[in-house]
Amino acid sequence: PGSGVAIVVDGGYQNAKTIEYAGNNQAFIAWVDYREGANANIYCQRLDVGMNGLFQENGLPIANTTNQETKPRATFVNNETSFITWKQGSTDSKIFYQFVDDDGLVFDVERPISDYDSTQALSRVKRNSTGEVFVKWTDYRDEPTNGDQYFQKIDVNGDRQWGNGIKVDSDNSRDFGARFSGGDEGDLNVVWERGTFPEIEIMYQNIQSDGSY
């Protein structure tokens, strides 16, 4: 057996990694990096089939500010482009995203998943067959205690398609535990849990390509 390939050997603590196919038989890896001490940042690396890193040694910084940047989630878009999202901040946190190709960062600055001024956390991502990316997060704009599950669609150019996000459940009950899969026509299929124990139901919704349902 092999001994493995070091993705990062710089000082500090690294965790919360994510790995996805990146096109051209490459892999995209991102992680939370504490090389600057208590300040958490997001770094990434691409590996070719020979397990060679294609970015700079110890990784390319994606989010490197004085804020805490954690919870990276990645997926493949198309060609050699990857999508990554993460949480910025601790209390009043926000969700941001970026495209990364084989040359590095695609956007000059990271993009917010929503312009609505609310606390955002707990993102998940999936792509569909055409490379559109769907992002789920917990948003506290209407429910400050438990939050609600919101969704955003990002097209292959990196532009948001669903405004400030689509709230999947308009009921006043608690909603949580969403799992989702992109459809063939730009739509999204979502299942989630509604209610509180012991009265919990499994719900389903199809969000159409334009964000309606």
Where are these regions (language model features)?
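Extracellular, repeat-based ectodomains that mediate carbohydrate processing or recognition
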Residues: 1-213
